[in-house]
Amino acid sequence: MQPYEPKTKKPVVHRAIFEAIKQRIKHWESDATIIAGRFGSGKSVAVREALRGVQGVFVHSIEDADWKDKLFKRLGLAGPDMLEDVLCRVQAQLEKLGGLSKVPIIVLDIPRTTMEGMDTVSSFAKYLCSDDTMKAAAHVIVCASSAAMAMAFDAGGEQRQKNYWVEDFTDDEAKEFLALRGHREDWEQFVQACGYRALDLDLTCGDYEGPATLAAKKEEMDKKARKEVLRFKDQCKIAGDTGKEILEELLANRQAGKGADELCTAASPKDVAMWIRERGYHSVIWHTVKQEYQFASELHANAATEILKSTPSRRHNWP
């Protein structure tokens, strides 16, 4: 049984989240694992690196409502009836090998473009991870492209899933990441221009032609953050001035280093997360582990400070 080896085109910075996921795999007993985080934070990389060298891993992308049929076809199965027997055989082999995981691992990767199929993902994961009637189990890891997709997952309540959140880079991670791309000395200029999101830093490294590239990138990022904050404030009106209420609460709590509780607005976090996903104005995120709203980045927090300081406040505490 071949160990899983992710295809990586560039050097990867080791991150604490890799080890956290590895420990989950090593000590797994039941229930699905959900990996979420801001778009471009490196969720897929985190999952794949945590699984590097692990045996019994299968990765499948959820692209439409027919994803299960495609999964069975890729596994060489005529249908779901054969799945349990295959899992039994794989589990028996894994127990003999004594590797990190004693059960098969199925990774379900959900791209941002996926619009359907989450209900069947939830039931599939519950069946494989938590169903006591199964002769064999499988550890299902769901890598969700957005908080909305992670929150749409429901395998029987929070007690039947374990959530992990992939943050943006820390200072040390960003420094190492940029050093690997030839920017050890000017790494601070990169994060000042781009922030700490892995995708932004990676793309800017690819485009870099000198200091002017960073100046142009900073201007572009500032404009984008301002636009996203304005759109969220003015257009997110799920239940009253939803967007504005969330932004005001975030600013009020910013100095204390806290996010905004879901009760700062009458709208549910799930509805807000879906609105953000559908509209594409990612100024705010719902953190699925800390269970709070947060600014997507310091750029968005700074833009919100400037925009709201001239706007009358109408904060509420909703029941």
Locations of regions flagged by a protein language model:
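Residue-level preference for the first positions of well-ordered beta-strands
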Residues: S30-I34, G56-V57, V103-V107, H139
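C-terminal leucine-rich, beta-strand-based interaction scaffolds used for sensing/assembly
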Residues: D222-P319
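Conserved NTP-binding/hydrolysis module of P-loop NTPases
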Residues: R52-G56, D64-K96
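Conserved Walker B catalytic segment
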Residues: V90-Q159, T170
